[in-house]
UniProtKB/Swiss-Prot annotation:
This is FMR1-interacting protein NUFIP1. Transmembrane segments: none annotated. Signal peptide: none annotated. GO terms for biological process: box C/D snoRNP assembly; positive regulation of transcription by RNA polymerase II; RNA processing. A motif (Bipartite nuclear localization signal) lies at residues 243-260. The keyword rRNA processing does not apply. Residues 1-108, 277-357, 413-435 are annotated as: Disordered. InterPro entries: NUFIP1-like, NUFIP1_cons_dom, Znf_C2H2_type. A zinc finger (C2H2-type) spans 174-196. Keywords: Metal-binding, Nucleus, Phosphoprotein, RNA-binding, Zinc, Zinc-finger. It comes from Homo sapiens (Human). The keyword Hydrolase does not apply. The lineage of its organism: Eukaryota, Metazoa, Chordata, Craniata, Vertebrata. Pfam families: NUFIP1.
């Protein structure tokens, strides 16, 4: 008994194609043999029977019941497909057009077209094979014509492909300009306005929501946020008057000069040290001297000589070469030149002081010159006078003979010049290609200034006031001849 089959089943002797892959049936007995297997395989398959039901059990196969087809043989080429296609027969896969490549039921004509045109991707071989799952290039065997794989990105979900619709902006009829909010109806607007509060400051009339008022107070009334207010004519006139007082006119310049002279007479000659980023760009700063080597060439040579002398192991390292000690030195110069930047980490073992200054006053100044912010006790540096052989009576003598400091200065100069020449020659020998860089090499080794501590920057006004008080005390001691050394009282009064 014949079993019911679907429309796509074939008669006995044909293998079903699960993926609609054409198969080759047995050749007819009358077909002439080919020279090679390829030409034999390229022959079109025989057409399927018109009826969908299977033949009876004792019947012969369809290939034997039908009359044999005469295949047209051409030497060296397969027969054309159109010559053996019968009505209702399915052409081979290679001969199908992309539009008519769908599987057709047995009862439908071949001129049927679907609403969406589909086509099957063909492999690179001559015969189409089953698609392999491990090949990502042929993972999807077919696509709609208008959604081709070359132009469509299937990695994105379909929701993202669609364009997002623009949301309609809400329409507000009531606005609060202070809070920058809008409301749709009068009730919400009235509720919001009832939540407005006033700024807690007395002179401020700002009203807004509580959170907005908090931001307003932080930005306008917080400590350190006070700004110039020129709302009334009186405030504008007061501000203009202050500007006129500080404007650098000739009268204001003369007035400032007089104030400066009065401070110098009192002994308050120090000013508050300025700290900031632009301090390194000043005229006498360390960075300015490095960037402009030509302007301070003499100063660099003097420092190089001093370093050469202090670096040597000779007996001249006990002297501080800051210049020849003057016979009539002003003790104010010791504290004027000693600001926060003059404190070095490495203190000299010995120092030369002027003859007029007494040991008690020198110890006071040396202990004061130490770092005030340090926790440890200030260490007193040992003081060595210029000439121990000369006694105190030579200080009182105005017509004293020439001090041996001049001979020491000449010896130091000759020694430093010889040292610098030897240093230059050794540098040229070791680096013959960098003779031109000797000047730059010499300017790099300059004394580093002391980096100010945070405590020094915070207490800069107090430090300036304290040092000015000490300078006034020193001035008073010299004028009144407190120690009984009537050296040059007349000259000190003129100062």
């Amino acid at each position: 008994m014949a079993e019911p089959t679907s429309d796509f089943e074939t008669p006995i002797g044909w293998h079903a194609s699960p993926e609609l892959t054409p198969t080759l049936g047995p050749l007819s007995d009358t077909a002439p043999p080919r020279d090679s297997w390829m030409f034999w395989a390229m022959l079109p398959p025989p057409p399927p029977p018109l009826t969908s039901s299977l033949p009876a059990a004792g019947s012969k196969p369809s290939s034997e019941s039908q009359p044999p087809m005469e295949a047209q043989s051409l030497p060296g080429a397969p027969p054309p497909f159109d010559a053996q296609i019968l009505p209702g027969a399915q052409p081979p896969f290679d001969a199908q057009s992309p539009l008519d490549s769908q599987p057709q039921p047995s009862g439908q004509p071949w001129n049927f077209h679907a609403s969406t045109s589909w086509y099957w991707r063909q492999s690179s071989d001559r015969f189409p094979r089953h698609q392999k799952s491990f090949n990502p290039a042929v993972k999807n065997s077919y696509y709609p014509r208008k959604y081709d794989a070359k132009f469509t990105d299937f990695s994105l979900p379909p929701s993202r492909k669609q364009k997002k619709k623009k949301r309609k902006e809400p329409v507000f009829h009531f606005f609060c300009d202070t809070c920058d909010r809008g409301f749709k109806n009068q009730e919400k607007y009235d509720k919001h306005m009832s939540e407005h509060t006033k700024c807690p400051e007395l002179d401020c009339s700002f009203t807004a929501h509580e959170k907005i008022v908090q931001f307003h107070w932080r930005n306008m009334h917080a400590p350190g946020m006070k700004k110039i207010k020129l709302d009334t004519p009186e405030e504008i006139a007061r501000w203009r008057e202050e500007r006129r007082k500080n404007y650098p006119t000739l009268a204001n310049i003369e007035r400032k000069k007089k104030l400066k002279l009065e401070k110098e007479k009192r002994g308050a000659v120090l000013t508050t040290t300025q700290y900031g980023k632009m301090k390194g760009m000043s005229r006498h700063s360390q960075m300015a001297k490095i960037r402009s080597p030509g302007k301070n060439h003499k100063w660099k040579n003097d420092n190089s000589r001093q370093r050469a002398v202090t670096g040597s192991g000779s007996h001249l390292c006990d002297l501080k070469l800051e210049g020849p000690p003057e016979a009539n030195a002003d003790p104010l110069g010791v504290l004027i030149n000693s600001d926060s930047e003059s404190d070095k980490e490495e203190k000299p073992q010995h120092s030369v002081i002027p003859k007029e200054v007494t040991p008690a006053l020198c110890s006071l100044m040396s202990s004061y010159g130490s770092l005030s912010g340090s926790e440890s006790e200030p260490e007193e540096t040992p003081i060595k006078t210029e000439a121990d052989v000369l006694a105190e009576n030579q200080v009182l003598d105005s017509s004293a003979p020439k001090s041996p400091s001049q001979d020491v200065k000449a010896t130091v100069r000759n020694f430093s010049e010889a040292k610098s020449e030897n240093r230059k020659k050794s540098f040229e020998k070791t680096n013959p290609k960098r003779k031109k860089d000797y000047h730059n090499y010499q300017t790099l080794f300059e004394p580093r200034t002391h980096h100010p501590y945070l405590l020094e920057m915070l207490l800069a006004p107090d430090i300036r006031h304290e040092r000015n008080v000490i300078l006034q005390c020193v001035r008073y001691i010299i004028k009144k001849d407190f120690f009984g050394l009537d050296t040059n009282s007349a000259k000190s009064k003129d100062v």
